[in-house]
Amino acid sequence: MQTRNTFSWIREEITRSISVLLMIYIITWASISSAYPIFAQQNYENPREATGRIVCANCHLASKPVDIEVPQAVLPDTVFEAVVKIPYDMQLKQVLANGKKGALNVGAVLILPEGFELAPPDRISPEMKEKIGNLSFQNYRPNKKNILVIGPVPGQKYSEITFPILAPDPATNKDVHFLKYPIYVGGNRGRGQIYPDGSKSNNTVYNATAGGIINKILRKEKGGYEITIVDASNERQVIDIIPRGLELLVSEGESIKLDQPLTSNPNVGGFGQGDAEIVLQDPLRVQGLLFFLGSVVLAQIFLVLKKKQFEKVQLSEMNF
């Protein structure tokens, strides 16, 4: 009987521990989800909508610039650099999930043409490896090797992210052709404002959910506020919860309207997207162009020599 009770107690403890770990995981995931492009993997099959909008913008509401640099043309089965630039003021600090201020991280999603993919380590030159640093890239999906994600990574070190890309070879991949292709990029700096479930993070403005008089502002022990709003017309009370890390714009006794901002906007980051074009060049076409240019140069040389020879003949005839 005692053994049975012991096993029952052990089973309950294991179940309780698993439940606690699961809750910690859910809370932690909720606090960071949708903060960087890499988390879009968990919610969207494709990061680029039919309208051309990259889904990271659903959670990063502020618009910021992003730029991409790629070669104008590449040869098949060669490795090239795609450099994504995510500029921002390095002196800025953002509100973290715990309410404290910290440095901004960055992330990016790179949408390549079908057939283009992350270059294998043995094809990357030492010079390119030095530019890449300690970055670790991932495929957006196992079956989508042409879509790469990175982040979050420290923005002060990686405001420029170098992707090593392997160009496809139409000789071995019949779905690839020698054409001009588009490349799309999305990049963000800082945390998002909206979580995937639609709830707000503590990196955005909180507005009043009702109009009336602010009856009470309670500062919570672990940070944040409870703001009690009383509707003067019907004495109905509404409590708005403000998470930690935000600065209040209102005070007790103040009259406010529906949707009036209760806090300042703490967001200093944002998301941007851009595009570029790259040509997968046929080596035979390049050779043909070089042959043509060589022929033109030779023709010009022969023309000059012929002209000089003609001038010499004319000069000798005049002397004769």
From Swiss-Prot:
Binds 1 heme group covalently. Heme binds at residues 36, 56, 59-60. The keyword Methyltransferase does not apply. The keyword Manganese does not apply. The chain crosses the membrane at residues 286-306. It comes from the Eukaryota. This is Cytochrome f. It comes from Lobularia maritima. The gene is petA.
